Amino acid sequence: MSILNDDLTLDIKKTILHAEMVIDNGCHGAAIFGSTGQAQLIPVSEKINLLNHLTSSKHKEKYIIGTGLNSLGETINLMRVSKSLGFNRFLIMPPAYYKYGDKEVIEFYSKIVEAISDCEIVLYNFEKLCGYKFSIECIEELVKKYPKNIIGVKDSSYNLFENLKIDNFSVLPGSESKLFKGLQLGCSGIITATCNATSTPVSYTHLTLPTIAG
């Protein structure tokens, strides 16, 4: 979650303190610049400023950085900055506004991995925000091409978590309402906005990828 000042600039200190708090309270990590973190509204310059300060956080190794932007070039540039600061795990939603199919989305992620080969990417499936809904076939193709890079998916469209089964791949529903069914089906946990307010009672174990406040 991003915390803003009265003038709508990013309050870096409070945002980092909040991220540390949810981890202290039991979450396995925190997503920086997810949808609840207002990823598409915060200027890239402010994101970079926060990332520079985030390097000093006591939980640096537990953050996943949301770098997905409508511009492929800006997405890659923000990832490069993040990598230079020691962050290696990213949450990336496909570009919004224009309509895309599986072919275009595979190309989008392929160009990212080809530009930054040493990274781990959690796909972000949220049709309501970006206009595209991942198919199982699309994800299977991406994992087949880049098994060391495409490590999981946050499923906020809920068309994947019941049926997507890939070895060494984490499926994380975006809501507590899907968590227990998801765990029964083999999901790894959740990435959820609710943890920002209730991190202590919704901490869960036996995960291959951390339960994350997003």
Regions inferred by a protein language model and the residue ranges of each:
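Short glycine-rich loop/turn motifs that provide flexible caps or phosphate-binding loops at active sites
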Residues: H28, F33-T36, I65-T67, I151, ...
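Active-site beta->alpha loop and helix N-cap motifs at the rims of alpha/beta catalytic domains
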Residues: I3-L4, I12-G131
